[in-house]
Design a protein with these regions (language model features):
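C-terminal active-site "lid" helix and adjoining low-complexity regulatory extension at the edge
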Residues: 230-276
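A short beta-strand motif that forms the metal-chelation/ATP-contact edge
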Residues: 55-60, 135, 175-177, 184, ...
C-alpha cells in the first residue's frame, strides 16, 4: 500500500572499515531518524545505479572512497544525470566529488589553500620543506596518502597525484553545512589524535572562511564539510572540500545539535524532492 511519503534510497557501505571510527553507526542512526518522514531503503554503492529509479531521491552518505570503485561510480553519475534522478548531495560539486583538481585551481587563484602541485617541475612553487605529502587526486579518507622526503619526489609517479608540503599546524577543524547553511564545527585540539574531535566555536572570520568555499562550490542541495588547518601564524588553510560523502562525526556533538542537524537534513531532502 502506498504511504504517500517521499521514497529515499540511502547509499552506504555499512561494512566499510574506517580508521578510528565506525561509519556504519552514523548511517544506522540517520536512517532510523529519517524513517519518521520518508519511506527509506539502504543499499550498497555498487547497487545504487540499478535501484535508484524507484525512488524520489538518492542520498549518498558513507559510501567509501570512490578510488575503490571508480568505474561503477562514474556509471552511476552518468545514469543519474542523464535520467534526472535527484541525488543528495547534487552531482554538480567541484570539490572532492570531482577529484582534488580544485586544490590546484584554488591555490593558483590565490585562495587560502594548502599549497598544491601535480607536476615534479612545479615543486619549486611550494614552500621549501624537507618533507612532503603525496596523495591521489581521487583519494579519500587518507587512502593512498604517503609522506615523502624532498629527495624522493623524483621517484614518484605523478599520474593523478598531488604533492603538498607537510604543514606544521596547531589543529585541524571541520565546518559542516547542509545546503548553504552552517550546522556545527568540530576540531582536533591534539594533532596526533586527529579522530578525537571536540566542539569548536567558530568566530566570524572562521565562518567567513568556510562559507567562501561553500559559496564557490556548485551545490545547492547537499551536505558539505570544509576541512581546514590552523597554521602557526593563525591563518586557516583549506585541506579539503568534501562534498561527496563526508563523515559527519555526529557522535561528537551534543544531542540538541544532533537533533537540529536531523531537522535541517529532513527539510533539505523535502526541498529537493519538491524541486521540479
Amino acid at each position: 500500500m502506498e504511504s504517500g511519503r517521499p521514497r529515499v534510497l540511502y547509499v552506504s557501505d555499512l561494512a566499510y572499515q574506517a580508521r578510528g571510527r565506525r561509519y556504519c553507526d552514523e548511517d544506522i542512526y540517520l536512517t532510523a531518524r529519517l524513517r519518521g518522514r520518508f519511506d527509506l531503503a539502504i543499499c550498497h554503492p555498487l547497487d545504487a545505479r540499478a535501484l535508484m529509479h524507484g525512488f524520489d531521491a538518492v542520498v549518498v552518505r558513507n559510501s567509501g572512497p570512490v578510488l575503490h570503485y571508480r568505474d561503477e561510480y562514474d556509471a552511476f553519475r552518468s545514469a543519474a544525470t542523464e535520467t534526472g534522478v535527484r541525488v543528495f548531495t547534487e552531482l554538480t560539486g567541484n570539490g572532492d566529488m570531482a577529484g582534488k583538481q580544485y586544490l590546484l585551481d584554488l591555490y593558483a587563484q590565490g585562495h587560502p589553500v594548502i599549497p598544491t602541485v601535480d607536476r615534479l617541475e612545479d615543486v619549486g612553487r611550494l614552500p621549501d620543506t624537507d618533507v612532503y605529502v603525496a596523495k591521489p587526486k581521487f583519494g579519500a579518507d587518507s587512502a593512498g596518502l604517503v609522506v615523502v622526503a624532498r629527495g624522493d619526489l623524483p621517484g614518484l609517479d605523478f599520474t593523478d597525484l598531488l604533492v603538498q608540503p607537510r604543514i606544521d599546524f596547531e589543529y585541524e577543524v571541520s565546518f559542516y553545512f547542509i545546503d548553504h547553511e552552517f550546522q556545527y564545527a568540530l576540531y582536533a585540539p591534539r594533532p596526533q589524535q586527529r579522530w578525537e574531535l571536540e566542539t569548536y566555536q567558530p568566530d566570524t572570520d572562521d565562518l567567513a572562511f568556510a562559507q567562501r568555499f561553500i559559496d564557490w562550490n556548485s551545490v545547492e542541495h547537499g551536505i558539505q564539510r570544509v576541512d581546514a588547518c590552523r597554521a602557526r601564524d593563525g591563518a586557516l588553510l583549506l585541506v579539503e572540500l568534501e562534498d561527496l560523502n563526508p563523515y559527519l562525526s555526529l557522535d561528537r556533538v551534543d544531542p540538541a545539535t544532533r537533533d537540529r542537524f536531523v531537522e535541517a537534513l529532513t527539510a533539505a531532502l523535502l526541498r529537493l524532492v519538491a524541486r521540479p
